Structure formats: C-alpha cells, structure tokens
Amino acid sequence: MVLNSDLTTQDKERIINPIERPTITQDLSENVILTTVDDLYNWARLSSLWPLLFGTACCFIEFAALIGSRFDFDRFGLIPRSSPRQADLIITAGTITMKMAPQLVRLYEQMPEPKYVIAMGACTITGGMFSVDSPTAVRGVDKLIPVDVYLPGCPPRPEAIIDAIIKLRKKIANDSMQERSLIRQTHRFYSTTHNLKPVPDILTGKYMQSETRFNPPKELTEAIGLPVPPALLTSQTQKEEQKRG
C-alpha cells in the first residue's frame, strides 16, 4: 500500500467513531422529514392567522373596511380575536401614547409564541403628526415591541393592509424549526433613534400676561384699521434696528 503524501487533511478519509453522534443527523436543516414538517407547520400557521386588533385612531377605520364584504379578509383565514391568549398577530393601528404603552406591552406578552406584529400607519411607525409637539406620543411602536411588517400611510388603504398580510404570510412560510430559537422576538428587536428638535413651550400658562394681549402686533392693527400705539411703534422700530445692527 502506497501512501499519498500530497493529500491534504480535508481530502483524507475521516475515521468514523461509533460512539459519537451520527453524521447524518448532525445537520438536520436539510433533512427531508423536518423540511416537510416545517412546510406543513408553516402552512397551517399562515393559513389561520388570528389577529388581535389594537385600534386607537383613524387607521382602524380602514381596517374596519377590510372586514366588510368588499375586501373579505376571511379568505386569508383571519379570525379576529378579543383575547390575546388566542391571537398570534397583533395589528397596532393608530397613535400610541405613553399612558397606553404598558397595556400594549402587556397584551403582547400575553400572546403565545410564535407571534407577529404589524405596525399600521405613520402614527404607529414614527409618531406621525403627533410627534411634532406632543409630549405623550410614542415615536414608533418598535420602541415597545418588535415589529415584523411596517405598513406606512395616513391612513393606509385596505389594499395596502392585504399586501402587508401577504408579506407576513411569505415570511412565515420561510420559518425553520432549527432557526426558530435564533429569530425569536427578543433577538430581532429593532428600534430607531429619533432626533428631536427642542422648541420653546407654546402653552406656558401666562397667556393673560402676554405682551400681545395688551399690545397687538403691528400687522394686525394695520389690517384691522386701528391706529398703532406709539409704544408699540417704538418697540417695533427698536427691534428692527437691533436686527439690522
């Protein structure tokens, strides 16, 4: 027997140890049986999604239109549930406030695994128009719970909701039992940082003491036809000179 010294370590025949784990079961991700079970399990889940409706604002009106006979979302196997313990999908539609945040997190934690989240509407995703000057609006529901599908719009149409459900079904169809522990909700948490621009408070509680209450702006007095007070005229000229200088 002649030994070939040119063979590398990878080309040499590996010695089989009868005590160790069999090679055929070391990597079960490509196993035919588990692949079939995955497909069957995923098909059953994506064909019978039970959503928990968490509507807080006008976006929920569009979802209510989706329940009607015109769009008929029952064809996707969606059955709305009133209890989070019987739901595997939560659809947040509308503005989420700081006072409402603990209740939303509690509902999400009561849902059994696997569970999914659809963020519906601009107010849910980024805070929307309420994120400008509202101190109580949450700037994105992904700061509270992980989101699987983002559905932008103000509000999104029922056709867009159907498209989001189809995308979620495709995502469920690609799940694997071997990877399920690695893509749990806690491991795919996503959050965005929002750069808030500080502005002076509008409501200071000193409206009765404001200067404009006693001395209206010059433009307003000229538009109404009232004579401009000398003190106001003097202050306006002083401000203009300060800006020029």
Swiss-Prot record:
It catalyses: a plastoquinone + NADH + (n+1) H(+)(in) = a plastoquinol + NAD(+) + n H(+)(out); a plastoquinone + NADPH + (n+1) H(+)(in) = a plastoquinol + NADP(+) + n H(+)(out). The keyword Ion transport does not apply. SUPFAM superfamilies: HydA/Nqo6-like. It is an enzyme of class 7 (translocase). One of its GO terms (cellular component) is respiratory chain complex I. Its cofactor is [4Fe-4S] cluster. Pfam families: Oxidored_q6. Its EC number is 7.1.1.-. InterPro entries: NADH_UbQ_OxRdtase-like_20kDa, NADH_UQ_OxRdtase_20Kd_su. [4Fe-4S] cluster binds at residues 58-59, 123, 154. GO terms for biological process: aerobic respiration; electron transport coupled proton transport; photosynthesis, light reaction. GO terms for molecular function: 4 iron, 4 sulfur cluster binding; iron ion binding; NADH dehydrogenase (ubiquinone) activity; quinone binding. PROSITE patterns: COMPLEX1_20K. NDH-1 can be composed of about 15 different subunits; different subcomplexes with different compositions have been identified which probably have different functions. This is NAD(P)H-quinone oxidoreductase subunit K. It comes from Nostoc sp. (strain PCC 7120 / SAG 25.82 / UTEX 2576).
